[in-house]
Amino acid sequence: MEVNILGVIAVALFILIPTSFLLILYVKTSAENKDN
């Protein structure tokens, strides 16, 4: 079975970008809550 590298990269980006964005937002909000 042949693995399409571009497909793997596309899926990785599709998964990593939103999760990292959510992670950053979560850390930001939790840090702000700690300051209060």
Curated annotation (Swiss-Prot):
Source domain of life: Eukaryota
UniProt record, GO biological process: photosynthesis, light reaction
Record-linked InterPro entries: PSII_PsbM, PSII_PsbM_sf
Record GO cellular component, one term: photosystem II
Transmembrane segments: 5-25
Subcellular location per the Swiss-Prot or TrEMBL entry: Plastid, Chloroplast thylakoid membrane
Pfam families assigned to the protein according to its UniProt record, in alphabetical order: PsbM
This protein's UniProt keywords: Chloroplast, Membrane, Photosynthesis, Photosystem II, Plastid, Reaction center, Thylakoid, Transmembrane, Transmembrane helix
Recorded topology in the membrane: Single-pass membrane protein
PANTHER family linked: PHOTOSYSTEM II REACTION CENTER PROTEIN M (PTHR35774:SF1)
Quaternary structure and interacting proteins, as annotated: PSII is composed of 1 copy each of membrane proteins PsbA, PsbB, PsbC, PsbD, PsbE, PsbF, PsbH, PsbI, PsbJ, PsbK, PsbL, PsbM, PsbT, PsbY, PsbZ, Psb30/Ycf12, at least 3 peripheral proteins of the oxygen-evolving complex and a large number of cofactors. It forms dimeric complexes.
Function: One of the components of the core complex of photosystem II (PSII). PSII is a light-driven water:plastoquinone oxidoreductase that uses light energy to abstract electrons from H(2)O, generating O(2) and a proton gradient subsequently used for ATP formation. It consists of a core antenna complex that captures photons, and an electron transfer chain that converts photonic excitation into a charge separation. This subunit is found at the monomer-monomer interface.
Family according to the record: Belongs to the PsbM family.
Name of this protein: Photosystem II reaction center protein M
